[in-house]
Amino acid sequence: MLMLLVFGVLLHEVPLSGQDEAHPEADRVPGEALYDYSSLRLPEEHIPFFLHSNRHVASVCREDSHCPYKKHLESLNSCWGYEKSCTPESRFGSPICSYVDLGWTDTLESAQDMFWKQADFGYARERLEEIRMFCRPESASDSSLLCSRYLQYCRATGLYLDLRNIKRNHDRFKEDFLQGGDIGGYCKLDRHALVSEGQRKSPLQSWFAELQGYTQLNFRPIEDAKCDIVVEKPTYFMKLDAGINMYHHFCDFLNLYLTQHINNSFSTDVYIVMWDTSSYGYGDLFSDTWKAFTDYDVIHLKTYDSKKVCFKEAVFSLLPRMRYGLFYNTPLISGCQNTGLFRAFSQHVLHRLNISQEGPKDGKLRVTILARSTEYRKILNQNELVNALKTVSTFEVRVVDYKYRELGFLDQLRITHNTDIFIGMHGAGLTHLLFLPDWAAVFELYNCEDERCYLDLARLRGIYYITWQKPSKVFPQDKGHHPTLGEHPKFTNYSFDVEEFMYLVLQAAEHVLQHPQWPLKKNHDEL
């Protein structure tokens, strides 16, 4: 039985305990549902994909007259793409490739497959295929440790963590924070295999520094009462990127979502522990987003200082700056776009944060201009551009400045998600494109010679992207003045030719009106 459990974990068939499981009770009240379906909190479109990977829930639903998802029982072939039983035609969407990048491959089919593996659910499949057991249990009460290659993702049971003798300083990711015996479990450890996974040892790329000292203990931490604190709930450990920058912080959230897929569990009845070896706090301008992943406040690791803490189940999440990871360090084949992963992430977060689509509006295109109140990359003739937009009766124009002290993040998301054309200068605020509707267009007014960043993010999300094309019609205030690098295009402000600006916006509008998911086709001729 134990070996079946081990193999089930490796084959992605066993979710975190208590997660998404159906428990029909013999003594339940007559007339009650057999399962708490409301606890799923998934977008309707995701339900058949969830049921595919959770056949026990599907079986209960089939027998339960109260199940609201019976219509999805006919679509159980639908799958995300990483499941072993998943066929390409049943996947949650497929990338679209318009040409072959001969530097990578030589056919459209192979380009599509490569893009899917680089940045879609194929990435999850490759991580799942890498998973191996590093510390093997020999009985049901033993600990365990399994990880993907380079210890980029790990999952542990019966984890022992001794924080009685740690020393904190200013370093958020101190590599010698734990000493021998400070972390481990009661299981048979393959130490040679574990220490051979250190090729990508780096704070935000691997858990190697934290787990290289994992010790085979001679006691069962929980059963032998060796813990000051026993954490019963499944716990996700995360090393976080900059919480004040949306681009970097959403690398955290995207990788947490991908980790949930690898775990086959989307429950919010979990703890999230921020692995931070400093004594500092963490500034988080996007903290509302955690509500999509947990019912509880994020816990700083220092909360457990001076204690021996044991975790029944722990997950070491995929990290935000992994080499060839998502999405900070992602090398992408050109010519392809539209990943199911990023679209699913967008839908998942919006659904759980209760952000709804209130349009589109009949006879209107909702245009949002993201202004900047920072020192650099301001639009110097912004009023002139806005007035030009207002001459088009079809455009409903809104200028916003996403300053967190004046506009909460959830309100920012509501504006973004109810935008058809999103316009802004190069900067982290353009990460909002992740939450535009599928038919929308994003116009990076000027990319400041950083050509790939938001172009690639738009490709991943499947959103139409344009940027300024004619250097002779954009006018920098000066050559830019970075404090250490000298002249730099990101460190100045810009004016733009109004006629060229309008030409590009109308090009974006044309795309929106022709998009197959745009529901108001009659507006095309009016524009």
Curated annotation (Swiss-Prot):
An example molecular function term from Gene Ontology annotations: protein O-acetylglucosaminyltransferase activity
Transmembrane segments: none
UniProt entry keywords in alphabetical sequence: Endoplasmic reticulum, Glycoprotein, Glycosyltransferase, Signal, Transferase
Superkingdom in the source lineage: Eukaryota
Glycosylation sites: 354
Entry's Gene Ontology cellular component terms: endoplasmic reticulum lumen
Entry-linked Pfam families: Glyco_transf_61
Reactions catalysed, as given in the entry: L-seryl-[protein] + UDP-N-acetyl-alpha-D-glucosamine = 3-O-(N-acetyl-beta-D-glucosaminyl)-L-seryl-[protein] + UDP + H(+); L-threonyl-[protein] + UDP-N-acetyl-alpha-D-glucosamine = 3-O-(N-acetyl-beta-D-glucosaminyl)-L-threonyl-[protein] + UDP + H(+)
Keyword Lipid biosynthesis in record: no
Main location: endoplasmic reticulum
The UniProt record lists the keyword Lipoprotein: no
Enzyme class label: transferase
GO BP term, pick one: protein O-linked glycosylation
Residues spanned by motif Prevents secretion from ER: 524-527
Motif Required for optimal activity, chain ranges: 295-297
Location of the protein in the cell: Endoplasmic reticulum lumen
Signal sequence segment: 1-19
Family the UniProt entry places it in: Belongs to the glycosyltransferase 61 family.
Name the record gives this protein: EGF domain-specific O-linked N-acetylglucosamine transferase
Species, as recorded: Rattus norvegicus (Rat)
Lineage: Eukaryota, Metazoa, Chordata, Craniata, Vertebrata
